[in-house]
Amino acid sequence: MRFISLLLLLTLIFCSKEATGTSDRISETTINLDNIETDPWWNDAVFYEIFVRSFYDSNADGVGDLQGIIQKLDYLNDGNPNTDTDLGITALWLMPIFPSPSYHGYDVTDYRNIDEEYGTMNDFKALITAAHARGIKIVIDFVGNHTSDQHPWFTASASNESKRDWYLWNSNKPSYNGPWGQEVWHERNNSYYYGVFWGGMPDLNYTNQEVTNEIKNTLRFWKEEVGVDGFRIDAVKHWIENGDQQENTAATLAWWRDLYVFQKSLDPGLMMVGEAWTSTQNIAPYSDKRLDYCFEFDLSYALIDGINNQTNSGLKSKMSEIISTYETNQYGTFLTNHDQDRSFYRFGMDERKAKLAARILLSLPGVPYIYYGEEVGMLGQKPDEDIRRPMQWTSSANAGFSSTQPWHPLNNNYVNYNVANQQLESESIWSQYQIWIKQRTRNTALRSGNYDFIESNNSRMFSYLRADSESNTAFAVIHNLSSQNTDDITIRINNSSLTEGTYNLINILNNQNMGSINVSSSGAFDTTLSEVTLAAYSSFLLKLEGS
């Protein structure tokens, strides 16, 4: 049942009529957000980000495509939790699949079609059907802040036709630059239009209600007629400008609040995750019933830096801020994405660090995202094309990606770092991803349990308690960020949600008893795991079992 009252709908209609002018006329509606039902399936998901062009080529043209993803679904999740040949992810984020003049697709020319290099709408619907049969959700990249300058809307706007005010025009070039000092006003036909990223990506004018209505109808199309499970929304903080204030404006936040109500009216389970590339405190308002959640960039930096610098201080403080800032678990976690140097490159090709990063990512709270190829140690350093290279499937010609020359050169390390090789090794990067994905999927405490930092006598240990009262399960997760083995590990918590009693610490990866703890009535414990050694860049996943 969808709980949206008639009064709420009338309020939205009235607000929409008032939202056709400049940005200062857009204000947040007064609505009872508690009356909006949501179905947060993403809290139980492990996402996998795919650049379709680089995943798998099914038709020998050197370009990855939708049929290629279909052919590789059993690698991602074969639908059988008892097998160990699939990775085990439960949701896909597809980078842009709309028609576009660029290889990356972030400048759209048609919001209701599929890039012909990737396939057809029927191919995409077949992918959704096949994915759903395996328990995999499908989320698509929606680039709504701007279009291509080749989009029919913009060509009509530039020629002073009916869609002039679908974009932002000025007869004289404003004097200000963009948020990072870039040119944002671009000349066309003796006028200037606004494009925060570059001239080939003109920003849409969301103070025009016609634009908002068109985008809402487009989202409805992809949900109701095509069947997607959600959207990753690009560049959410740039939606509406107020003069030279070009990020995080009040009008932008108001627009997203209105869209949230619309989104949940389509389907309580329709997910929207936002890219707001900014600090935790600036991200937080977008996650407050405007989008379901946003990506946590600061945490990704803290995670990689913590491993490289062998200290828990940044991770400890960042997790403390996150826990106090967001609604429980409502943030996306990741190592790196398609806009950043790949994590294996950041770790200097140290496999131990790559494995440790995977274990931390998959045992922390939040909604984890894996960038394709991360699980096999793909390398990549900017420019962007080089962090989006073809997937490394095998050591054979073209890395098993295609039977012909790929659209972009392969990484040199594909002969050793590929799916086929790593699936044969029990201690490979791939194996660590698979093992910890499955542990997360099987254990509610690792997906949605409480998080409490575990103090230690060693700043190179990053440890925490994940506890779930409903399933009555808890885990102590202990990571050694150091390049040295660590003995006699002290673990200490002053209070937690644990009930009083004595618990054995069982390493669920090998069923070994690692000792015990005595928990007080406040949930506190303090013990030393004597005669226990945690190897460099290694982890313990200890289940607390009452004795």
Language model features: what each stretch is:
Residues S520-S547:
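C-terminal beta-strand-rich structural cap/linker in extracellular carbohydrate-active enzymes
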Residues D24-I140, N145-T147, P152-A156, S162-K163, ...:
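N-terminal structural segment of carbohydrate-active enzymes
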